[in-house]
């Protein structure tokens, strides 16, 4: 076998390997492991559950039992759409004004008999401080993330968890949400607002070219740590 043939076969094998790897799914910017939240179920010892009577057509937790409402997520592995609309607006200001004044008056009259006139001693001190400070921060996050019902709590509430990964031009964005929702808060379109999610954990992170360029370099961080001014 000639050297050119060997090179051609090696290139063909490499190309086939690349195609096989890319066919398995989208390539992440770095290693990606979906987050899983270990949610501790609250103690339900004080909650009573009422069993359906014999022969009843209504069963708790069954979508078919909701005769006058649309089908909604009620059981494990059901899907529910979470509409994330988070707005944070925080402002804080402080004004400090301190003033202090002290005076001291003393006179010497008969300490020494040779003094014909008394001598007076006076002293005083003034100090003051005034400081002003203010801070403001506004954040807004809007997204739509489908979530899966991971657990059905004893009181009927649902623990949901959802991921969403978007890859555009070597920039990878990750959406994550988890929390507890009430079935009554799920609307007719099988969706719920993030403001109705209790014990919520909402994350929006990114990695890739843009995220790397926005991050300060290690040398700049090191110099900033040592520089006292």
Swiss-Prot record:
This is Flagellar L-ring protein. GO terms for cellular component: bacterial-type flagellum basal body, distal rod, L ring; cell outer membrane. Assembles around the rod to form the L-ring and probably protects the motor/basal body from shearing forces during rotation. It comes from Anaeromyxobacter dehalogenans (strain 2CP-C). One of its GO terms (molecular function) is cytoskeletal motor activity. Keywords: Bacterial flagellum, Cell outer membrane, Lipoprotein, Membrane, Palmitate, Signal. The lineage of its organism: Bacteria, Pseudomonadati, Myxococcota, Myxococcia, Myxococcales. Its main location: membrane. A lipid is attached at residue 24 (N-palmitoyl cysteine). The gene is flgH. The keyword Lipoprotein applies. The basal body constitutes a major portion of the flagellar organelle and consists of four rings (L,P,S, and M) mounted on a central rod. Residues 1-23 form the signal peptide.
